């Protein structure tokens, strides 16, 4: 069957054109890259009912479902209603009746109103990782209602620490969780584990004073990674409760 397809309109609806004529790939938003496992049933149902039975973990942490025929897009959008309501509207607090913060009623049977700001990606952060300085998922969900829905082609990556596993340096807005450390000399046994960790994995700002057996720090070049905290066997280094972030602008490569 031949169709006169408005490809731009399909893209705004989060359906990417395939190299196969008349087929599209749905991109389901997953802000921060983590949702309840129950939502995998949505992916499975769409892939097996209207797609080709496969899905791809998108490079921006979306659920990308391939092989959807153009004529099946309305049915897919109608099925997506509950997912969008629960993940974007309820979990992230997105006002779906606005676009770029201007009133625009959303038709819940019509799928995503815009592709706009791309899905916010995040590493696992301190939800799981011993290196994480911040809860990346919570931050992503706070940012989501600020940038979505909109027509701005913005990419935001969140990294939980300066290791930058999520490549915050390579997007429009990169956010990196950093920490300020507090030294507790009364707990320090002078083992030098933190000095070695900083020398090997960070910026060599720590040194062991042989006279006092305590650690000295040159704060000028500390990147806030927290490697000293991770290495210390006696908790002589701890992260301060206040959260800090390094924001990087204009690093997008694609």
Task: Please state what every model-predicted region is.
Residues 1-23, 38:
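Intrinsically disordered, low-complexity polar/charged tails and linkers
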Residues 2, 26-189, 219-221:
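Small-residue-enriched alpha-helical segments and adjacent helix-cap loops
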Residues 15-20, 51-57, 205-208:
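Short, flexible, solvent-exposed loop/turn segments with mixed acidic/basic and small polar residues
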Residues 16-20, 111-116, 239-241:
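Short glycine/proline-enriched loop/turn "hinge" motifs that connect secondary-structure elements
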Residues 21-23, 151, 242-244:
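A general secondary-structure signal for short beta-strands and their flanking turns/coil
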Residues 193-212, 223-244:
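Iron-sulfur cluster-binding cysteine motifs and their immediate structural context
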Residues 242-246, 251-254:
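A hydrophobic, small-residue-rich beta->alpha segment in the mid-to-C-terminal subdomain
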């Amino acid at each position: 069957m031949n169709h006169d397809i408005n490809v731009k309109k399909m893209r705004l609806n989060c359906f990417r054109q395939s190299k196969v004529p008349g087929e599209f790939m749905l991109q389901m938003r997953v802000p921060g890259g983590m949702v309840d496992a129950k939502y995998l049933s949505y992916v499975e149902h769409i892939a097996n009912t209207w797609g080709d039975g496969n899905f791809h973990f998108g490079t921006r942490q979306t659920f990308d479902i391939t092989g959807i025929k153009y004529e099946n897009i309305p049915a897919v959008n109608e099925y997506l209603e509950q997912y969008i309501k629960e993940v974007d509207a309820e979990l992230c607090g997105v006002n779906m009746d606005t676009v770029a913060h201007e009133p625009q009623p959303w038709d819940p049977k019509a799928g995503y109103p815009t592709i706009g700001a791309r899905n916010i990606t995040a590493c696992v952060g301190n939800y799981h990782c011993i290196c994480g300085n911040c809860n990346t998922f919570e931050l992503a969900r706070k940012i989501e209602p600020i940038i979505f829905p909109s027509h701005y082609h913005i990419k935001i990556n969140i990294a939980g620490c300066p290791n930058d596993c999520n490549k915050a340096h390579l997007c429009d807005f990169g956010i990196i969780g950093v920490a300020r450390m507090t030294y507790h000399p009364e707990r320090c046994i002078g083992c030098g584990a933190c000095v070695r960790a900083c020398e090997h994995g960070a910026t060599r700002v720590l040194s062991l004073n042989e006279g006092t057996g305590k650690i000295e720090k040159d704060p000028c070049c500390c990147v806030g990674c927290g490697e000293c905290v991770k290495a210390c066997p006696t908790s002589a280094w701890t992260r301060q409760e206040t959260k800090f972030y390094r924001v990087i602008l204009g690093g997008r490569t694609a």
